[in-house]
Amino acid sequence: MRDSEEVPGIDREPLQGDAVHLADRIKEELDLLARNVDILEKLAKSPPIGIIRLSEALELPIHKTRYSLHLLEREGVIQPSADGAVVTDRAAEFWSSLNRSLDRMTELIEHLRSRAVEHQSRPPSGRKGY
């Protein structure tokens, strides 16, 4: 998923003033995760590849590619080499952990969606304040 793609069901209108939807912040983190996954997949399928070729192959700005490479290296799933970044043995552990995390997030999202639908169908209570 590219940064410009929209996630269905997330209203993009800001709250009053400069307030930001909590869902927008979560979506930004998911966009970053998706970019990291794209990069890790590309590195796993390719021989060592440098940052410029990687950016071009994934149609990403170099600064975003560099940041994702930094995060993946910090996690220990890639390491630099003379020819570019390479995937380490810890990648398998990363994929397992990601799958578990996504399962937990999916459960939480389904729970939140059911609560949001429930509240959306209720008439306002008319109460003011907290």
Predicted regions located by residue number:
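Long, compositionally biased intrinsically disordered regions
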Residues: 1-12, 83, 129-130
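Short amphipathic alpha-helical interaction segments
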Residues: 30, 59-74
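Amphipathic alpha-helical dimerization/coiled-coil segments
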Residues: 10-16, 20, 97-130
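Short alpha-helical segments that sit at the start of domains
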Residues: 7-39
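Residues within the helices of the helix-turn-helix
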Residues: 41, 51-52, 70, 83
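A short, conserved structural fragment
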Residues: 73-83
